[in-house]
A protein has these predicted regions:
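Hydrophobic transmembrane alpha-helices that form the pore/transport pathway of multi-pass ion
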Residues: 114-202, 362-404
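Transmembrane-helix bundle segments that line or gate the permeation/cavity pathway
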Residues: 165, 170-173, 177, 208-223
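Membrane-embedded alpha-helical segments and adjacent helix-loop junctions characteristic
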Residues: 64-150, 301-385
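Transmembrane alpha-helical segments and their short flanking loops
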Residues: 184-194, 222-251, 272, 276-294, ...
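Interfacial loop-to-helix junctions that mark the boundaries of transmembrane helices
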Residues: 36-46, 74-77, 109-114, 231-242, ...
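C-terminal transmembrane helix pair
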Residues: 188-208, 350-462
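Short juxtamembrane and helix-loop transition motifs at transmembrane-helix boundaries
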Residues: 97-107, 125-126, 223-235, 397-401
Length: 462
């Protein structure tokens, strides 16, 4: 009897030590990620170091090393399916610059801006461009930079305009057929991308309308004093700007409406842009090959050269590496049941509004801990999927809820690269967060929607 009591106590102490060592390792990983982001280091380095720390910790706790690698590999397989799409998106970004598509979108788009409603116009324009490009970073670094330069020249508060630009940039990052995060979530939840996008649009209307009203009143109080800048004047000097160069973007738009497979859509758009780059913009085949692989760069010391740069296969290799390491890392964390205590907190939740509120909390904490949008998505999925299955929620509901929480909340965490990088590109700081209205209205309105339906159902049965 005494012997059994001692064994039980030792077992409990051992479990407590194991839990403490896991928490210490996770905290250390968080600090490493945070330092990496604030210092501007490539996040894959900190993720790789975090992976080593967790492998050592769990091996010390008694998990077979081979089993840990298997957990990570099985999880990372989900990332492999979107690597091709990521690489194609990288090519699209660079080749659209070389073909004149992105310069034309910036040039024509800014022509429609009303000085009196500049902030509202900036939000709407970045929404449109982000849907076409499918990347928040690409939108911010092209049309976003042009708008910020115009805003600063017109004496508009940079935090307000940055908030409108970043909110608009994540409109497309959330619901564009070219969005890497949308593809990742569809892959994780085993759902159809186009069905997801249709559902996302239905949950976006009220937050979008409310955001436009807010930006309308902000525009009235902050009219721009100047609407032209050298940046826009440079575009037609360097590129042949005409409606023909918009064909790659139009191809994506119409092929997506026809629900053509995304890889085929991107490949067709790339082929059209390649033709335009060679025969309209007069680049050589070798130059276009370099653009496809290494990204687009203007060899001049101008503001346009700073704004129009990037893309290419190489740029997406870095992103792909982050996605693979992140999924590997999360696979080990989930496989070792390190966060089992967190999952227990959700067991008593049964209402849709309560479940969505839990997803918001998990998405926010994951965004704060992971420091990247990718980790926020992966951790939210892994922590919430069992509860959604338990409540007999469809995979589509889980996909939409992740889009409406982790995806849009990540940019609102000051040290998460989803918001830190766009803010840095726009030469501002976390002061943009209160003005990124659309990003926090998405989860708020969706929670209100769930709550409203529940209250109506309660009244029916009273």
């Amino acid at each position: 009897m005494f012997f059994n009591s001692v064994i039980n106590k030792l077992f409990i102490i051992g479990k407590e030590i194991q839990t403490m060592s896991s928490l210490f390792s996770l905290t250390l990983c968080f600090v490493i990620l945070l330092v990496s982001v604030t210092k501007g280091y490539f996040v894959a380095y900190s993720l790789g170091l975090s992976l080593v720390i967790l492998l050592v910790t769990f091996t010390y706790q008694g998990f077979p090393f081979a089993s840990l690698l298997k957990m990570g590999y099985i999880s990372s397989q989900k990332a492999f399916s979107i690597i091709t799409i990521l690489l194609l998106i990288g090519v699209v970004t660079s080749i659209w610059m070389a073909s004149g598509t992105i310069p034309a979108l910036v040039y024509y788009g800014t022509q429609f801006i009303n000085p009196q409603y500049f902030i509202l116009s900036a939000f709407l324009l970045t929404c449109i461009i982000s849907v076409l490009l499918g990347t928040s970073f690409g939108t911010v670094s092209t049309v976003g930079v042009a708008l910020m330069i115009m805003a600063k020249e017109g004496n508009i508060d940079p935090h307000i305009i940055a908030g409108a630009i970043i909110a608009g940039a994540y409109f497309g990052d959330r619901c564009s057929p070219m969005s890497s995060s949308a593809h990742l979530i569809a892959s994780l939840t085993k759902t159809n991308l186009y069905k997801n996008l249709a559902y996302l649009m239905t949950t976006a209307w009220f937050p979008f309308i409310a955001s436009t009203i807010v930006y309308f009143f902000l525009s009235l109080g902050n009219p721009i004093q100047a609407t032209s800048h050298n940046l826009l004047a440079e575009i037609p000097q360097i590129f042949d700007i005409n409606f023909l160069v918009l064909c790659p973007a139009l191809a994506v738009f119409f092929l997506c409406l026809m629900k053509i497979e995304v890889k085929v859509t991107l490949a067709i758009s790339i082929a059209i842009a390649l033709f335009l780059g060679i025969f309209v913009q007069n680049y050589s085949w070798l130059q276009m090959f370099q653009v496809i692989v290494f990204g687009f760069h203007l060899h001049s010391q101008t503001q346009l050269a700073e704004a129009l740069t990037g893309g290419g296969i190489v740029s997406m290799l870095r992103v792909s590496l982050v996605v693979i390491i992140s999924t590997f890392l999360v696979g080990i964390i989930v496989g070792t049941k390190t966060l089992a205590s967190v999952e227990k907190l959700f067991r008593r939740i049964s209402s849709k509004s309560g479940l969505f509120l839990s997803t918001i909390a998990v998405g926010l904490v994951s965004a704060a801990f992971g420091c990247t949008q990718t980790l926020a998505i992966l951790m939210t999925y892994q922590l919430m999927k069992d509860k959604y299955e338990q409540e007999k929620m469809s995979h589509y509901q889980l996909a939409i809820d992740i889009e409406n929480t982790a995806v849009v909340l990540a940019p609102l965490v000051p040290w998460n690269i989803a918001g830190l990088v766009p803010a840095t590109v726009l030469m501002t700081d976390s002061g943009f967060i209160p003005y990124a209205v659309y990003l926090y209205l998405i989860p708020v309105f969706n929670w209100i929607g769930f709550k409203f339906v529940e209250l109506r159902m309660q009244r029916k049965f009273e």
